[in-house]
A protein has these predicted regions:
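N-terminal anchoring/stem segment of glycosyltransferases
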Residues: 1-84
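Short, solvent-exposed loop/turn segments at secondary-structure junctions
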Residues: 15-18, 45-48, 61-63, 91-94, ...
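Short beta-strand-to-loop acidic/aromatic patch adjacent to the donor-nucleotide binding site
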Residues: 82-94
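Catalytic core and acceptor-binding pocket of nucleotide-sugar-dependent glycosyltransferases
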Residues: 129-218
Protein backbone atom coordinates (compact mmCIF):
# COMPACT_ATOMS: atom_id res chain seq x y z
CA UNK A 1 0.00 0.00 0.00
CA UNK A 2 1.36 3.39 -1.01
CA UNK A 3 2.06 6.02 1.60
CA UNK A 4 -0.10 9.13 1.20
CA UNK A 5 1.35 12.57 1.74
CA UNK A 6 -1.79 14.41 2.85
CA UNK A 7 0.04 17.71 3.27
CA UNK A 8 1.82 17.69 -0.09
CA UNK A 9 0.63 18.69 -3.57
CA UNK A 10 2.52 17.20 -6.51
CA UNK A 11 2.98 20.00 -9.04
CA UNK A 12 4.65 20.65 -12.40
CA UNK A 13 4.70 23.62 -14.79
CA UNK A 14 5.58 23.53 -18.48
CA UNK A 15 3.91 24.78 -21.65
CA UNK A 16 6.37 23.53 -24.28
CA UNK A 17 4.55 21.02 -26.53
CA UNK A 18 7.60 18.75 -26.73
CA UNK A 19 7.85 18.60 -22.93
CA UNK A 20 4.24 18.07 -21.84
CA UNK A 21 4.13 14.32 -22.46
CA UNK A 22 7.38 13.81 -20.58
CA UNK A 23 6.19 16.00 -17.73
CA UNK A 24 3.02 13.93 -17.37
CA UNK A 25 5.13 10.77 -17.44
CA UNK A 26 7.34 12.16 -14.67
CA UNK A 27 4.28 12.97 -12.58
CA UNK A 28 2.88 9.48 -13.19
CA UNK A 29 6.14 7.95 -11.99
CA UNK A 30 5.78 9.95 -8.77
CA UNK A 31 2.14 8.91 -8.40
CA UNK A 32 3.06 5.26 -8.85
CA UNK A 33 5.29 5.55 -5.80
CA UNK A 34 3.35 7.83 -3.44
CA UNK A 35 -0.14 9.28 -3.12
CA UNK A 36 -0.55 13.03 -2.68
CA UNK A 37 -3.31 15.37 -1.57
CA UNK A 38 -3.56 16.26 -5.26
CA UNK A 39 -1.44 16.31 -8.41
CA UNK A 40 -1.56 19.42 -10.60
CA UNK A 41 -0.16 20.10 -14.05
CA UNK A 42 0.12 23.78 -14.93
CA UNK A 43 -0.01 24.59 -18.65
CA UNK A 44 -1.59 27.18 -20.92
CA UNK A 45 -3.65 24.59 -22.82
CA UNK A 46 -5.29 21.55 -21.23
CA UNK A 47 -3.58 18.43 -22.60
CA UNK A 48 -5.69 15.82 -24.33
CA UNK A 49 -5.98 12.46 -22.59
CA UNK A 50 -4.69 13.81 -19.27
CA UNK A 51 -4.78 10.97 -16.70
CA UNK A 52 -7.66 11.16 -14.23
CA UNK A 53 -5.28 11.40 -11.27
CA UNK A 54 -3.76 14.67 -12.52
CA UNK A 55 -5.64 17.99 -12.35
CA UNK A 56 -5.04 20.61 -15.03
CA UNK A 57 -4.82 24.27 -14.04
CA UNK A 58 -4.10 27.22 -16.29
CA UNK A 59 -0.72 28.93 -16.18
CA UNK A 60 0.67 31.39 -18.74
CA UNK A 61 2.64 30.32 -21.79
CA UNK A 62 6.40 30.11 -21.28
CA UNK A 63 8.12 32.20 -23.97
CA UNK A 64 11.58 31.92 -22.45
CA UNK A 65 13.40 30.72 -19.34
CA UNK A 66 12.82 34.07 -17.64
CA UNK A 67 9.03 33.66 -17.95
CA UNK A 68 9.32 30.27 -16.28
CA UNK A 69 11.47 31.49 -13.42
CA UNK A 70 9.29 34.51 -12.69
CA UNK A 71 6.11 32.42 -12.47
CA UNK A 72 7.62 29.74 -10.24
CA UNK A 73 9.22 32.42 -8.05
CA UNK A 74 6.09 34.48 -7.44
CA UNK A 75 2.96 32.57 -8.52
CA UNK A 76 3.41 28.85 -7.81
CA UNK A 77 1.78 29.11 -4.40
CA UNK A 78 -1.50 30.26 -5.97
CA UNK A 79 -2.03 26.66 -7.10
CA UNK A 80 -1.31 25.02 -3.73
CA UNK A 81 -3.70 24.61 -0.80
CA UNK A 82 -1.61 22.14 1.21
CA UNK A 83 1.25 23.05 3.53
CA UNK A 84 3.83 21.91 0.96
CA UNK A 85 4.30 21.18 -2.72
CA UNK A 86 6.68 18.76 -4.40
CA UNK A 87 7.80 20.41 -7.64
CA UNK A 88 8.76 17.98 -10.42
CA UNK A 89 9.57 18.06 -14.15
CA UNK A 90 9.96 15.71 -17.09
CA UNK A 91 13.56 15.14 -15.99
CA UNK A 92 13.00 15.41 -12.24
CA UNK A 93 10.87 12.96 -10.28
CA UNK A 94 10.81 10.43 -7.42
CA UNK A 95 13.25 7.53 -7.58
CA UNK A 96 12.92 5.78 -4.21
CA UNK A 97 9.79 6.50 -2.19
CA UNK A 98 11.09 4.51 0.79
CA UNK A 99 13.51 7.34 1.51
CA UNK A 100 10.72 9.85 2.12
CA UNK A 101 10.69 11.24 5.67
CA UNK A 102 7.82 13.16 7.25
CA UNK A 103 10.56 15.04 9.07
CA UNK A 104 11.16 16.94 5.84
CA UNK A 105 7.88 18.79 6.29
CA UNK A 106 9.50 20.88 9.01
CA UNK A 107 11.49 22.62 6.28
CA UNK A 108 10.26 25.30 3.91
CA UNK A 109 12.67 24.43 1.10
CA UNK A 110 14.55 21.31 0.03
CA UNK A 111 16.51 20.68 -3.15
CA UNK A 112 19.60 18.86 -4.38
CA UNK A 113 22.96 19.96 -3.00
CA UNK A 114 24.82 22.41 -5.21
CA UNK A 115 28.49 21.69 -5.93
CA UNK A 116 31.25 23.97 -4.69
CA UNK A 117 31.97 26.22 -7.67
CA UNK A 118 34.21 29.27 -7.54
CA UNK A 119 32.22 32.52 -7.57
CA UNK A 120 28.87 30.68 -7.69
CA UNK A 121 26.13 30.18 -5.09
CA UNK A 122 27.57 33.01 -2.99
CA UNK A 123 25.63 35.66 -1.09
CA UNK A 124 26.64 39.31 -1.36
CA UNK A 125 28.72 38.95 1.81
CA UNK A 126 30.50 35.85 0.49
CA UNK A 127 28.59 33.09 2.28
CA UNK A 128 28.47 29.87 0.24
CA UNK A 129 25.01 28.31 -0.17
CA UNK A 130 24.70 24.57 -0.87
CA UNK A 131 20.89 24.01 -0.87
CA UNK A 132 19.59 23.98 -3.35
CA UNK A 133 18.39 23.08 -6.79
CA UNK A 134 14.75 23.83 -7.61
CA UNK A 135 14.14 21.35 -10.43
CA UNK A 136 13.03 18.70 -7.96
CA UNK A 137 12.16 20.52 -4.77
CA UNK A 138 9.93 20.53 -1.72
CA UNK A 139 8.48 23.97 -0.93
CA UNK A 140 6.16 25.20 1.80
CA UNK A 141 3.30 27.62 1.15
CA UNK A 142 5.10 30.05 3.42
CA UNK A 143 8.12 29.93 1.12
CA UNK A 144 6.04 30.14 -2.05
CA UNK A 145 4.19 33.25 -0.84
CA UNK A 146 7.25 34.87 0.75
CA UNK A 147 8.25 36.88 -2.35
CA UNK A 148 4.79 38.51 -2.37
CA UNK A 149 4.70 39.07 1.39
CA UNK A 150 8.23 40.50 1.54
CA UNK A 151 8.10 42.34 -1.79
CA UNK A 152 11.07 40.43 -3.20
CA UNK A 153 12.03 41.00 -6.81
CA UNK A 154 13.38 38.33 -9.14
CA UNK A 155 16.98 39.41 -9.65
CA UNK A 156 18.95 38.70 -12.79
CA UNK A 157 22.44 37.38 -12.29
CA UNK A 158 24.69 35.15 -14.37
CA UNK A 159 22.88 36.45 -17.46
CA UNK A 160 19.40 35.16 -16.62
CA UNK A 161 16.81 34.93 -13.85
CA UNK A 162 16.97 31.71 -11.83
CA UNK A 163 14.22 31.28 -9.27
CA UNK A 164 16.10 28.84 -7.05
CA UNK A 165 19.10 31.15 -6.90
CA UNK A 166 16.80 33.98 -5.86
CA UNK A 167 15.07 31.91 -3.19
CA UNK A 168 18.17 30.28 -1.77
CA UNK A 169 21.01 32.73 -2.40
CA UNK A 170 20.13 36.28 -3.43
CA UNK A 171 17.32 36.79 -0.89
CA UNK A 172 18.37 34.21 1.69
CA UNK A 173 19.06 36.68 4.51
CA UNK A 174 15.62 38.25 4.23
CA UNK A 175 13.98 34.85 4.01
CA UNK A 176 15.84 33.53 7.05
CA UNK A 177 14.72 36.57 9.04
CA UNK A 178 11.17 35.81 7.90
CA UNK A 179 11.53 32.35 9.43
CA UNK A 180 12.16 30.25 6.33
CA UNK A 181 13.92 26.97 7.14
CA UNK A 182 16.15 25.35 4.53
CA UNK A 183 16.92 21.64 4.63
CA UNK A 184 20.48 21.01 5.89
CA UNK A 185 23.04 19.79 3.37
CA UNK A 186 23.29 16.31 4.88
CA UNK A 187 19.55 15.67 4.55
CA UNK A 188 19.36 17.34 1.13
CA UNK A 189 21.92 14.83 -0.13
CA UNK A 190 19.35 12.10 0.51
CA UNK A 191 16.40 14.16 -0.72
CA UNK A 192 17.62 14.73 -4.28
CA UNK A 193 20.54 14.31 -6.66
CA UNK A 194 21.71 16.65 -9.40
CA UNK A 195 25.51 16.67 -9.32
CA UNK A 196 28.13 14.37 -7.79
CA UNK A 197 29.31 15.94 -4.54
CA UNK A 198 31.01 14.65 -1.40
CA UNK A 199 27.72 14.62 0.51
CA UNK A 200 26.08 12.12 -1.88
CA UNK A 201 29.21 9.99 -2.19
CA UNK A 202 29.77 11.44 -5.64
CA UNK A 203 26.54 10.06 -7.02
CA UNK A 204 26.78 6.61 -5.45
CA UNK A 205 24.14 7.18 -2.77
CA UNK A 206 20.46 6.42 -3.24
CA UNK A 207 18.19 9.44 -3.21
CA UNK A 208 14.47 10.13 -2.92
CA UNK A 209 14.46 12.02 -6.22
CA UNK A 210 16.67 13.64 -8.83
CA UNK A 211 17.01 16.48 -11.29
CA UNK A 212 18.80 15.74 -14.57
CA UNK A 213 22.13 13.94 -14.96
CA UNK A 214 21.18 10.74 -13.16
CA UNK A 215 20.54 7.16 -14.02
CA UNK A 216 17.54 5.84 -12.14
CA UNK A 217 18.69 4.10 -8.97
CA UNK A 218 15.93 1.49 -9.06
Amino acid sequence: MKKKLNDVTLIAYDTRPDKIEGTILGMQKCLSRLDFASAKLLTDIEPKNLPDNIIWEYAPHINNINDFNLYVFSELGMHVETSHALYVQDHAYILDETLWSDRWLQYDYAGAVWPIVENSYLTDDGKRIRVGNGGFSLRSRKLMFAPRVLGLKLEQRQGFFNEDGNLCVYHVDKLLKYGIKYMPVEEAATFSYENPVLENNYGNMKTFGFHRNHRENE
